[in-house]
Amino acid sequence: MDISFYTGAGGGVWSLEECARWAKAHDFDAIRLSAGGVADPETVLREGPDEINDTLKAHGLYLAGLAAHNNLLDDDPEKRDAAASRLHKAIEAASRLGTPAVITHAGSPVGFRFYGGYSAPPGNPSDRSTELVGRFKERFTPIVKLAEEKGVKIALDVAVRMGNIACNPQMWERVLDAVPSDSLGLSCDPSHWLWMMILPPEDAIRAFAGKWYYADVKDCEVSREMLFRQGIIGNWWWQYRVPGRGQLNWGTIIGALLESGYDYVLCVENEDHGLPGLAGIDLGGRHLRQFLPKKGEPYDRPPGFWKVE
């Protein structure tokens, strides 16, 4: 496994050259770019991949993936068509860039309330999960076919609060079954599972062995005192942290990923209010590195996946 981080470059943030120079100086192997700025898909398709690839290669880095979050499940047909067009271009741009992964999300028109009212049984009048899985199949089938043709894998983000039906094991099964393809999988980010109580995270990883196509890694901290004071409807009883500043066991998580067949990047994502910016990304990368085999040393993976049945 390599270590990467998520950032934008160009378009008002730091330049790709500045980004690459910092990444190399802080022992990163790769970066993941958002589909904007220097990595805007229309720019890449019009001008080609050389500016990005040559700049990264000059610093001994590579592009780990392209982030293109677009809500293809919006209730407004025009908005979901526009989102599909943007994702289509991002997949074509990723193929031109030679990066194997596009990270997106399944989307949702109702935020995280797609199951309907709390404590209401499945199929209640406000439960839209079945409808939205059907919409996912309709909207993502041509997108996944394009990814197959272009040799790109789509990794679905597992975050929930952005509005995303693919946010828990039940819905991962449903969307992956709806569009079965080796080009559609998941992006591992166990920070969400801690506060959602999808625990232990290593069992969630092993249950979907072979379907982790990317690993967006954050940590999380739950305050039991604030949970007592606010209950789950509060807004401050959990916080995202960079790896090493939260409550997740990264040695165990990385072991589960390796045992589940994942051998690509660990991509640091910084939403840590207590250590924002590059300082947090640097700490996260250093914390993760200690759990990996030394560079150049192969990992002797056991035969077959260790999968929860």
Give the positions of each predicted feature.
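Short, acidic/polar
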Residues: G12-A23, D81-I91, M196-I205, W250-I253
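C-terminal helical cap(s) of enzyme catalytic domains, especially alpha/beta-barrels
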Residues: G277-P298
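Acidic/histidine-rich catalytic cores of soluble enzymes
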Residues: A30-I31, L63-L66, V133, K137-Q247, ...
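Catalytic domains of carbohydrate-active enzymes, especially glycoside hydrolases
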Residues: L16-G36, L97-A101
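Active-site beta-loop-alpha junctions enriched in small/polar residues
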Residues: Y6-G10, S34-G36, A68-N71, G107-P109, ...
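Glycine-rich, proline-tolerant flexible connector loops at the mouths of alpha/beta enzymes
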Residues: R32-N53, P109-R113
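Active-site acidic/histidine proton-transfer and metal-coordination neighborhood
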Residues: E17, D50, D54-Y62, D74-G185, ...
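Conserved, mostly hydrophobic/aromatic
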Residues: A23, I31, L56, A83, ...
